[in-house]
Amino acid sequence: MYEKTAEHFEQKYKNLPEGHLLVNLGPSHPATHGILQNVIQIDGERIVEAESVIGYVHRCFEKLGERYTYNQFLVCTDRMNYVSTPLNNIGWILAVEKMMQVEVPDRVTYVRMIISELSRIMDHIICLGILGVDLGAFSGMLHLFHHRENIYQIIEKLTGARLTTTFCRIGGLERDIYPEFEKEVKLVCKGLKPAIEEFNSLLLKNKIFLGRTEGIGGISAENAIAYGFSGPNLRAAGVDWDVRKDKPYMLYDKVDFDVPIGEDGSVLHRSLVRMEEMRQSIRIIEQLVDGIPSGAWHADLPHAYLPEKNKVYNNMEELIYHFKIIMHGVKVPPGEHYMATEAANGELGFYIVSEGEKSPWRVHVRRPCFWYYQSFAELVRGGLLADSVATMSSLNVIAGELDC
């Protein structure tokens, strides 16, 4: 291993062939959508070699996970893929609940699934909208961003925050859904359906967009698997793998939805897969929203779920539980577990090793962006510099998740 310093690049590329240039795409550049750096050697407009540099937003989350309690680490998950934070929250909480063998009420699972799919739609809107902007098609983005804002308003009313939601808890939710939740979710889905089709016509059927994306940045199924691809980027390469279908969690085995599959793993096919996934997410939400069961929004778990404040102030038993959870944390039984969920970008996995204390002994996060970014040099090598922007955008690399 070596550190990719300025001296490293100076030594490696000090004898460039005549006519070749070394350019930096990032770390501060609109096309990178985050603090990412790519050192690119070009011959005219053609990319000869590329090298990716990571770590600009590294915040030691895995090490923090060994110091924080299981509840405290939840705030770190908000700051991974900050475009669809509830999916990160749910992935972490499911891993902890699995280790504790906690069964949550169906109401909790329904709400978690609805929020997950709304977050997936938000993430795909960002990815597709910004891809259009990167290729010069600004107007198409506006058709979906209005509906993304409507989803944000639901999440803000439900959680109190737009980005750092921290909504899940071990054994349940932070609070119950508000009275108009089901109605507003159905209105959002109703508005999204025609908007998605309009956006599809404006962007994915546009001749210029097709010319800039078809066959660009492609990857074979074999190479995608070798690099560790998952999610929409893996399915765009023709691999039928979705954690929700192949290793179901929550109630995904009880709902009906299709898994879209691409062919050549190009920018176009990654876009087509994400477009269809938005339709399928709406389909999942509509199956759930009318059937949210009544009942509690958390399990009867006094040693792990904080009691209501009014009970803490008026009941000695609740006061003791509150004190124990805050001061001593939640004790997870000794053991190790890996929990994978299908986040918007792919398989988000949390590997936890517990020694029975209030903090994990070891935490590892399998973040999908990390694997995509490793492939970037191979995907753009031999292509045009302008096409590298589209390739990066279609991979949907989020710096907060990449560096973790």
Swiss-Prot record:
Give the record's membrane topology.
Peripheral membrane protein
Task: Output the Gene Ontology terms for molecular function.
Answer: NAD binding; NADH:ubiquinone reductase (non-electrogenic) activity; quinone binding
First and last residue of the signal peptide: none
User: What's one Pfam family here?
Assistant: Complex1_49kDa
Is Oxidoreductase among the key words of this record? Answer: no
Compartments where located = Cell inner membrane
What InterPro entries would the database entry show? NADH_Q_OxRdtase_suD (IPR001135), NDH1_su_D/H (IPR022885), NiFe-Hase_large (IPR029014)
Reaction(s) catalysed (UniProt annotation): a quinone + NADH + 5 H(+)(in) = a quinol + NAD(+) + 4 H(+)(out)
According to its record, what are the GO cellular component terms?
A: plasma membrane
Top EC class for this record: translocase
**SUPFAM superfamilies in the cross-refs:** HydB/Nqo4-like
The keyword Membrane appears for this protein = yes
| Domain of life of the organism encoding this protein | Bacteria
Q: What is its EC number?
A: 7.1.1.-
Q: Which UniProt keywords apply?
A: Cell inner membrane, Cell membrane, Membrane, NAD, Quinone, Translocase, Transport, Ubiquinone
> Hey, which family's this protein in?
Belongs to the complex I 49 kDa subunit family.
Q: What quaternary arrangement does the UniProt entry report?
A: NDH-1 is composed of 14 different subunits. Subunits NuoB, C, D, E, F, and G constitute the peripheral sector of the complex.
- Briefly state the protein's biological role: NDH-1 shuttles electrons from NADH, via FMN and iron-sulfur (Fe-S) centers, to quinones in the respiratory chain. The immediate electron acceptor for the enzyme in this species is believed to be ubiquinone. Couples the redox reaction to proton translocation (for every two electrons transferred, four hydrogen ions are translocated across the cytoplasmic membrane), and thus conserves the redox energy in a proton gradient.
Stored NCBIfam families: PRK06075.1
Q: What is the name attached to this protein's record?
A: NADH-quinone oxidoreductase subunit D
Q: Which species is the source of this protein?
A: Leptospira borgpetersenii serovar Hardjo-bovis (strain JB197)
